[in-house]
A protein has these predicted regions:
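C-terminal beta-signal and terminal closure region of outer-membrane beta-barrel proteins
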Residues: 2-4, 776, 780-783, 788-791, ...
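N-terminal periplasmic "start-of-domain" segments of outer-membrane beta-barrel proteins
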Residues: 58-93, 119, 127, 137, ...
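Extracytoplasmic beta-strand/coil segments of soluble accessory domains associated
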Residues: 99-141, 169
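Short acidic/polar hinge/loop motifs at secondary-structure boundaries
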Residues: 139-169, 220-223
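A beta-strand signature from Gram-negative outer-membrane beta-barrel systems
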Residues: 155-202, 256, 877
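Outer-membrane beta-barrel transmembrane strands
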Residues: 188, 205-206, 221-235, 248-250, ...
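Gram-negative outer-membrane beta-barrel transporters
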Residues: 761, 766-773, 777-933, 971, ...
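C-terminal beta-signal and adjacent terminal beta-strands/loops
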Residues: 761-764, 923-933, 954-1003
Length: 1003
């Protein structure tokens, strides 16, 4: 039988010093415990000594190579499976965006938003199941324009004030719950960790080429935008008092242009199916216009619309942190810190779109079993449908505040205690009088036969008969939305350690967490102008500016297709909105509502405790083990104010408005608890070689939109009915049983090779279910008395314009029928409301339940090699992830498949000497499933493989001054999403490279 040996190792020194409660600040300081706000440095070459003024003794190293060496030391000396990125120097992180840095780590992939990293996926597990900590504290998140979730948006944090990023991939009892893929700890500066004066200031000019390729009505700001950052840290009173202050302000102008089938593809249909939206069956009129018809058992879908949007963005990001530390004795250190960030985004958009009404058509198809149209044409004659052109102008502001206090007490040589408390908030809200989102729609009613060619990367829209002189643009609809999201976390954590022997340690802790999330919104929708209630003569031609479409997609295959409908008109949103408000005489309807009609609130109160026992063993080879368990209980309360729907009204050819009445509150609750065991072991196979094993259980809580009670109906419906959603606060967290294995060879000071294998067995995934319901008993005119009269008079059921004209011309003034003026093509406009004896409208309601399980496995390969003293170095990694739960494109209906799972690879080359440093980084992510629902229902969305090349070149003028050039996305890559077939385009985005030139002064 073996017993622990009283042997002091580098690991045990690091574990002991972890309880000294000092967060490392800079490039050479690497922390080891994500659950504690104060952590220490297992990578440091010199161990902590009790006589250190702040409990830490460090050696300052800087530069690219030093950053890689420190990251390697973190990986080598950590308990469990840990990777990280360490700052090159005070105030200098390898990437300008933290998510972009994280993607250099094996197993980590990122989602991009407005041209930069936003959210992370780790080992095939999506952003909502990766926990982000700031100095060991759980952080709230708020994002407008997305479903309320738990995914942290790294775009809110500037990298200049960050010391290191730690990615904990294996489970430990002391780690807070929520990170199934990983727990990511963002470490900022602490003054007592680095005694003396430390200061730096930097300026940067940013030129984003994407901001140039925009229409004049969308462009914002100048070609070059400024950034400034600074960091000051100092200690006094013999190292007992310290202050650190960091701040940054950054502006950025950018753009991105998108071609999309924004409302998804209708279907899927079987080749032999005959329904609204299907292609003509053999032997029926129109069947002769179909080439390579889908076989009877093939699946196919047809596009619902085609849209081109040009988006201009301005962003101002402000970050700041103040840290005060006081150590009244060598045994006690207190820390008070305040962190603030603000991210302001202004958006302008102009778009061109065409809707399909599933009338007579012609089409050419790919082969099955999942067929897609190469060309889809809807025959429209005469040319009097709408060519839609819209605009938007809105702004949002996100603010994050965190106030925290930490006290670390070394009771004696064996016992250390720590108390950490913080209150943090994240709040997103409108920052414009026009709301957080809006659309002002215009149209020319001169659209004839309309086609889309999907054979190239860019879907190519063609329109016959367009005549902007005969049918000038006119306002035909508007939507103004005010949305608000606030997340708040109040957390108290206690940590302790008892060094029982020199080679054994017991860790323990308690925590309470109170998390609140609020999501509220209101929609002001102008329905009675969608069909053109106002007339074109109300809007002078001078308000509209002619543009050429193809120039804004010049980097996408297909932009030079001569059939592309190239002419569209833009406008000044504010001016046209003001004119439309005057023309209609109802200006209040062209502004967002002042209050919220939907207000959903969720509160989670959690309590936890843990025990963890760490031991060094002296077998034939040194072994370190850690055994622990964590218990956690959570209570969930969801209160929702939702509007009560009161009517279902036909307001234009293919759109129905859901009328909303007085909102009402409902409250639902849920509760759960978990025991989460963990075990880590590593063995020194040789002095330069390690083997690792880990088993642990982790949980990840459901997104807030899945938990929130209250049934919410979308305000726009279609002929076939509407849509809605409803949460379930009784959802259990996803639980994962995790196994990790690794072999690591550190064959010199700066180089290593590692191979890892991981498995995750997940249960309680929230499956999405859709049921057809008839909420509130809303009546629809479809199939009612007026509708049937039009059918009886000879209108085809698919010819909705014929049906509307008949109803308006024969039943105007009757109950529910309000006729407006005819449009320029002689078609009647107005609204037709459902009547008491009409059919009840069907709604497809989406909800959630614990019903799914999944398994995934993967391999990680890492190599880092420095070529002696030449200054050259190489870093490469590849991650392979696999699961049996892929999406079956040939299957109809709801499916459960793991989203976000993909292979990924990184290749980084560096060169560094006393004067120059060069870094070229290529990141690649394979195709992955992003969602199992699109705008039309249960259909997949695939993000195609994407690779990006970034470059930085730095020059040290002297020991104080350095300059740097950076290039992002140098090869000008595009992003593309598709559906069941690669030709079934959903989204194609063109942005552009970004260039930066900076100077930095270090005091």
């Amino acid at each position: 039988m073996y017993y622990p040996k009283a042997k002091q190792t580098l690991m045990s020194l690091a574990v002991a010093s972890a309880c000294a409660a000092f967060i490392p600040a800079h490039a050479q300081e690497v922390a080891s415990t994500p659950g504690a706000a104060a952590t220490t440095d297992p990578a440091a070459q010199e161990a902590t000594t009790p006589s250190s003024p702040a409990g830490i003794q460090t050696v300052t190293v800087t530069g690219l190579r030093a950053s890689l060496e420190s990251s390697m030391a973190l990986k080598r000396n950590a308990q469990g499976f840990v990777d990280g990125i360490v700052a090159e120097d005070i105030g200098k992180f390898p990437d300008t965006n933290l998510a972009e840095s994280l993607q250099r780590i094996s197993g980590v992939s990122i989602d991009r938003s407005i041209g930069e990293g936003s959210k992370v996926t780790v080992r095939g597990v999506g952003p909502d199941f990766n926990l982000v900590l700031l100095n060991g504290r759980q952080m709230p998140t708020s994002i407008l324009g997305d479903r309320p979730g738990r995914a942290y948006d790294f775009a809110n944090i500037a990298s200049e004030g960050i010391s290191q990023l730690q990615v904990y991939k294996s489970a430990r009892a002391e780690t807070p719950t929520g990170g199934i893929g990983a727990t990511i700890n963002v470490i900022t500066a602490r003054p007592l960790s680095r005694p003396g004066l430390q200061a730096t200031i930097g300026i940067k000019g940013v030129h984003d080429t994407s901001a140039e390729n925009l229409p004049a009505d969308v462009k914002r700001g100048g070609k070059v935008t400024p950034e400034v950052s600074g960091l000051y840290s100092n200690t006094s009173a013999d190292g007992r008092f310290g202050i650190a202050l960091s701040g940054s302000y950054q502006e950025r102008n950018l753009g991105y242009n998108v071609a999309s089938v924004g409302n998804g593809w209708k279907g899927p249909f079987r080749g032999d199916e005959n329904n609204w939206g299907t292609i003509a069956q053999p032997g029926t009129p129109g069947s002769e216009n179909i080439t390579n018809r889908p076989k009877p058992t093939d699946l196919y879908q047809v596009p619902q619309n085609m849209n081109y949007a040009m988006n201009g963005i301005q962003r101002q990001r402000t970050n700041g942190q103040l840290t005060l530390q006081y150590a009244p004795s060598k045994a006690l250190t207190t820390t008070l810190d305040y962190t603030y960030s603000q991210n302001k985004i202004q958006t302008r958009r102009q778009d061109l779109s065409a809707w399909f009404n599933f009338g007579p058509s012609s089409s050419t198809w790919t082969d099955g079993p999942v067929a897609a149209p190469l060309v889809y044409t809807e025959i429209i004659n005469p040319a009097n449908s709408d060519i839609a052109m819209g605009g938007a102008d809105f702004a949002t502001r996100t603010e994050n505040n965190s106030l925290g206090f930490n006290a670390a007490w070394k009771v004696n040589s064996d016992i250390r205690l720590e108390l950490d408390a913080h209150r943090s908030t994240a709040e997103s809200k409108p920052d414009s009088p026009f709301g957080s989102s809006n659309t002002l729609g215009t149209a020319s009613f001169s659209r004839g036969t309309t086609s889309v060619d999907f054979s190239q990367d860019l879907p190519v829209l063609s329109i016959q008969g367009a005549d902007f002189q005969r049918a000038p643009q006119q306002v035909n609809g508007s939507v103004f939305e005010n949305a608000y999201v606030k997340s708040e976390i109040s957390q108290v954590q206690t940590h302790g350690s008892w060094k029982m022997m020199e080679a054994s340690e017991l860790k323990f802790g308690l925590a309470t967490t109170d998390a609140k999330n609020r999501s509220a919104f209101s929609v002001q929708q102008r329905d009675d102008t969608w069909g053109g209630a106002t007339k074109a003569s109300d809007y002078p031609a001078s308000y509209f500016h002619q543009e050429s479409l193809r120039q804004y997609f010049d980097n996408i295959d297909g932009h030079d297709n001569p059939n592309l409908f190239n002419t569209f008109y833009t406008f000044d949103f504010a001016a046209l909105r003001q004119l439309a408000a005057q023309v209609t005489g109802k200006p209040e309807l062209y502004m967002p509502k002042s209050g919220y009609t939907t207000d959903q609130r969720t509160r989670e109160k959690s309590k936890s405790l843990y025990l963890q026992f760490n031991t060094d063993w002296d077998f034939a080879m040194p072994v370190h083990t850690s055994v622990g368990a964590r218990y956690e209980t959570t209570e969930v309360t969801s209160t929702a104010l939702v509007p009560i729907a009161s009517s279902y009204t036909w307001v234009s050819q293919n759109e129905f408005a859901v009328g909303l009445g007085t909102p009402a509150f409902t409250t639902l609750t849920g509760k759960y608890h978990h025991w989460l065991p963990s075990f880590d072991a590593d063995i020194d196979l040789r002095s330069d070689m390690k083997g690792r094993f880990s088993y642990g259980e982790t949980i990840g809580r459901a997104r807030y939109d899945q938990l929130t009670g209250g049934q919410v109906l979308e305000t726009l419906g279609r002929i076939e009915g509407g849509r809605g959603s409803q949460g379930n606060p009784g959802l259990l967290p996803v639980k994962s049983k995790n196994i990790d294995l690794a072999w690591e060879w550190y064959y010199n000071k700066s180089s290593f090779v590692s191979v890892g294998h991981f498995r995750k067995s997940l249960e309680n995934y929230a499956g999405v279910s859709q049921v057809t319901a008839q909420p509130f008993g809303l009546r629809t005119p479809v199939g009612g008395a007026y509708w049937n009269a039009a059918i009886g008079a000879g209108c085809a059921s698919s010819d909705t314009m014929c049906i509307r004209n008949y109803i308006f011309r024969n039943f105007a003034g009757r109950p529910g029928v309000t006729r407006g003026p005819d449009d320029v093509n002689g078609n009647a406009t107005g609204s037709i409301a459902g009547q008491p004896n009409d059919p009840i409208a069907n709604f497809l309601i989406t909800s959630y339940s614990n019903q799914k399980a999944a398994r995934l496995r993967g391999l990680e390969f890492n190599v880092q090699h420095m070529f002696g003293t030449s200054g050259f170095g190489l870093q490469a990694n590849y991650t392979k992830v696999d699961s049996g739960l892929g999406y079956n494109n040939a299957s109809i209906g709801e499916q459960f498949a793991l989203v976000g799972m993909s292979d990924s690879a990184n290749l980084v080359g560096i060169f560094e000497n006393d004067k120059w440093n060069v870094r070229a980084a290529y990141n690649w992510r394979d195709k992955f499933l992003a969602s199992t629902f699109d705008g039309a229902g249960a259909n997949p969305q695939y993000v195609e493989a994407y690779g990006q090349l970034d470059l930085s070149i730095g020059y040290n003028v002297n020991k104080n001054i350095s300059v740097q050039f950076e290039g992002i996305n140098l090869t000008d890559e595009i992003r593309r999403l598709h559906g069941r077939n690669e030709r079934q385009a959903l989204y194609v985005e063109q942005s552009g490279p970004r260039y930066m030139l900076s100077a930095r002064y270090k005091f």
